[in-house]
């Protein structure tokens, strides 16, 4: 398999493809960038970025500009190849309205395995893992959080995302008290209606999560004001554990 063009200005990014020795342990193609201070004896926070419909492991690197230097960045590729190019986390049954439960469950199992394997092969602290998902990647993040009783996250960011309409997600979860959740959505989103974001916000608030919510006058993308808010949110959840005073480590790279 041919290696894609890695993101420019992202520093020492490593591509883990099918021939890489770490691939059998993770089962998802991914890119990773470790901070210089990362050691097995000194595991670091990590931010895992889940791309949207038709993206790949290089699609989410624009978010490096809001991620603190202290954190590793990991970008997995969704396991399903799309007919028109790129990759997807799950298929749809009716246009883009009803998720296909079988393909979603298959990807969910692989994502769970992937996340559980990361601290075994990289110097990452599993208790300081944050997820950022865009669109379908956010839908996968919500599905993971709502169905994984044992999952511990530093936080979850949902960008132009939604909770999939699946029976498995209908029952309320009771393990989300205090979970930091960031939601940003465009009021003119033509793909995922704004109401889906508001429903997501309301549900997590009922479940006890600490929700940071914002709407911006934009379409199916991330507004610059949302990026600034995301930067602050990430700093708060990842840097408070080191005192929050080390600007060199807590600023983005």
What do these predicted regions represent?
Residues 20-124:
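Serine-hydrolase catalytic machinery in alpha/beta-hydrolase-like enzymes
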Residues 51-53, 132-134, 186:
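Conserved alpha/beta-hydrolase "nucleophile elbow" surrounding the catalytic nucleophile
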Residues 62, 143-147:
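Active-site signature of alpha/beta-hydrolase-fold catalytic machinery across serine-
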Residues 123-133:
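Alpha/beta-hydrolase fold nucleophile elbow
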Residues 133-137, 141:
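Gly/Ala-rich beta-loop-alpha elbow adjacent to hydrolase catalytic centers
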Residues 151-163:
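A conserved short beta-strand
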Residues 182-185, 189:
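Short beta-strand/loop motif that positions the catalytic acidic residue
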Residues 195-201, 205-253:
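C-terminal catalytic histidine-bearing segment of alpha/beta-hydrolase fold enzymes
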